[in-house]
Amino acid sequence: MPRSLKKGPFIDLHLIKKVEAAIASNDRRPIKTWSRRSMILPEMVGLTLAVHNGRQHVPVLVNEEMVGHKLGEFAATRTYRGHAADKKAKKR
């Protein structure tokens, strides 16, 4: 169920401060964040955010289509290595 419109989007205060500082200083370095729950705002378009996936920070270049989504959607936390191969089928 989506968040109520009267509440507005959630974004961590420390992240919005870092974004505003990067915009003011025209800094293009990635902004490192652990806040996967924060929503992407229109002010973040064009910035690179390094989102933590539990092991490392994944660089995410924000574009206009990402506005309204959460940061965690763009940094996968699980790696799928595939199912085990069937040994009987390999011999044929």
From Swiss-Prot:
<dbReference type="GO" id="GO:0019843">
    <property type="term" value="F:rRNA binding"/>
</dbReference>
<dbReference type="GO" id="GO:0003735">
    <property type="term" value="F:structural constituent of ribosome"/>
</dbReference>
<dbReference type="Pfam" id="PF00203">
    <property type="entry name" value="Ribosomal_S19"/>
</dbReference>
<keyword id="KW-0687">Ribonucleoprotein</keyword>
<dbReference type="InterPro" id="IPR002222">
    <property type="entry name" value="Ribosomal_uS19"/>
</dbReference>
<keyword id="KW-0699">rRNA-binding</keyword>
<dbReference type="GO" id="GO:0000028">
    <property type="term" value="P:ribosomal small subunit assembly"/>
</dbReference>
<dbReference type="GO" id="GO:0006412">
    <property type="term" value="P:translation"/>
</dbReference>
<comment type="function">
    <text>Protein S19 forms a complex with S13 that binds strongly to the 16S ribosomal RNA.</text>
</comment>
<dbReference type="InterPro" id="IPR023575">
    <property type="entry name" value="Ribosomal_uS19_SF"/>
</dbReference>
<keyword id="KW-0689">Ribosomal protein</keyword>
<protein>
    <recommendedName>
        <fullName>Small ribosomal subunit protein uS19</fullName>
    </recommendedName>
</protein>
<dbReference type="InterPro" id="IPR005732">
    <property type="entry name" value="Ribosomal_uS19_bac-type"/>
</dbReference>
<dbReference type="InterPro" id="IPR020934">
    <property type="entry name" value="Ribosomal_uS19_CS"/>
</dbReference>
<dbReference type="GO" id="GO:0015935">
    <property type="term" value="C:small ribosomal subunit"/>
</dbReference>
<keyword id="KW-0694">RNA-binding</keyword>
<dbReference type="GO" id="GO:0005737">
    <property type="term" value="C:cytoplasm"/>
</dbReference>
<comment type="similarity">
    <text>Belongs to the universal ribosomal protein uS19 family.</text>
</comment>
